[in-house]
Amino acid sequence: MQRGLLRLRRSTNDWLTVRCGFAAFVPAAVALVSLRKRLGVPAVVTLPAISLLPLAVAAITPLSKWRYIAVGTSYMWAFKVTWELPYEARKKTQRPVHVRYPIRIDSLLGGGVPPTVRLQRALRDPTTVTPLDRAVAGIYASWLVPHLILGWILLRHPQFIPRAAGRLAATYHLTTPFYWLIPTAPPWLASESSGEMNGEVQRVLRHVIRDLRNQPRRETDNSPGNPSGSMPSDHIAAAAITAMALSEIDVAYGVLGWSYVVLASFAVVYLGEHYLIDVLAGLAVAQTVRRAEPFVSPFVRQLARVLKQIASSTTKSSLATGDGHP
């Protein structure tokens, strides 16, 4: 019995040491990433730090609904940063952005004319902001819907949350490498900066936002984030993987989820934020995640067990030393 307690104590102390290391890492990583521009921290340092942050948060947070919220919040910030990093690095190296290839593909898909051009010609008045512009911009602005749905699943169907959240995270993971490998200008940027598509495509979202603020119309802007992160559409990839999760809970929920995917796909193409090929690539990313799940799940479950052991090490330490007894 005494030997078993000694072994438990040693094992628990090891996990507790790891947990303390993660606890120290979290604020350090947050500070490093937040100050990266001011300090001139290179992407090769920032990327590993922000990528490990959600795992560190999971390791120091006891298993509960709050743990899902904490990890989800850290992961969304991690995605935002990893989405911005390629553009930040590219500004320093002046690496060119791809412009022509999506236009060629979309011209084939659109029967000679890119779908964005067709939609804006048919449905827009380029001189003003219409009710349709506002409605479609509202759909685009609802990109948080998949994350709100995850919150609803957590409250109403918690047994589905590990798979649903894991697949959404994997979807974001698969989109970010493309922003490094093939930085692609969206339709509005290709039209405005390079005169592609006869300069016809406008950034409708800019006009809607300025109209809502009662600001004068402007034909150019300095976009925050990553204006060359068009391929693939993470917006559509996230919506599609969430629709798949809803379909597993109930067919009616699945119909609602896929209806949102259709509306969001129309919105990003109409607004000039994405090409149709970006949308199709986003759907392909979601499908790839679903197909790969059976092969990746054993590794993920093992990682989850390790993180659970680390997170519960404080309680185990109390029991091993006798402090947990009344």
Regions found by a protein language model. Name each.
Residues V255, L271, L280-P326:
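C-terminal membrane module of polytopic membrane proteins
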Residues L132-P146, N226-E248, L276, L280:
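Membrane-interface loop-to-helix entry segments
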Residues P186, S230, L263-T288:
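Interfacial helix-loop-helix junctions of multi-pass membrane proteins
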Residues F178-E248:
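Membrane-interfacial catalytic/cofactor-binding modules of polytopic membrane enzymes
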Residues M1-P48, I60-L63, R67-V71, Y75-H147, ...:
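N-terminal transmembrane-helix/juxtamembrane module of multi-pass inner/ER membrane proteins
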Residues I149-R156, I236-G254, A284-E293:
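Membrane-interfacial alpha-helical segments at the cytosolic side of multi-pass membrane proteins
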